[in-house]
Amino acid sequence: MLFTVAWASLAAMFSFSIAMVVWGRNGDGTLNF
């Protein structure tokens, strides 16, 4: 259970950081992946 929660939070933080990099590189605030 604890491992599952830890893995889910790690995956969420990783995907969030990737999204921040994509949005920051895009520069105009649109969701253009």
UniProtKB/Swiss-Prot annotation:
SUPFAM superfamilies the record matches: PetN subunit of the cytochrome b6f complex
UniProt keyword annotation of Transmembrane helix present: yes
GO cellular component: cytochrome b6f complex; plasma membrane-derived thylakoid membrane
Source taxon at top rank: Bacteria
Membrane topology, record value: Single-pass membrane protein
Primary location group: membrane
Entry keyword Transmembrane helix: yes
GO MF entries: electron transporter, transferring electrons within cytochrome b6/f complex of photosystem II activity
Listed transmembrane segments: 2-22
Keywords per UniProt: Electron transport, Membrane, Photosynthesis, Thylakoid, Transmembrane, Transmembrane helix, Transport
GO BP term, pick one: cytochrome complex assembly
Localisation: Cellular thylakoid membrane
Family: Belongs to the PetN family.
HAMAP family with a match to the protein in the record: Cytb6_f_PetN (MF_00395)
Subunit structure: The 4 large subunits of the cytochrome b6-f complex are cytochrome b6, subunit IV (17 kDa polypeptide, PetD), cytochrome f and the Rieske protein, while the 4 small subunits are PetG, PetL, PetM and PetN. The complex functions as a dimer.
Biological function: Component of the cytochrome b6-f complex, which mediates electron transfer between photosystem II (PSII) and photosystem I (PSI), cyclic electron flow around PSI, and state transitions.
Listed name of the protein: Cytochrome b6-f complex subunit 8
Organism in which the protein naturally occurs: Parasynechococcus marenigrum (strain WH8102)
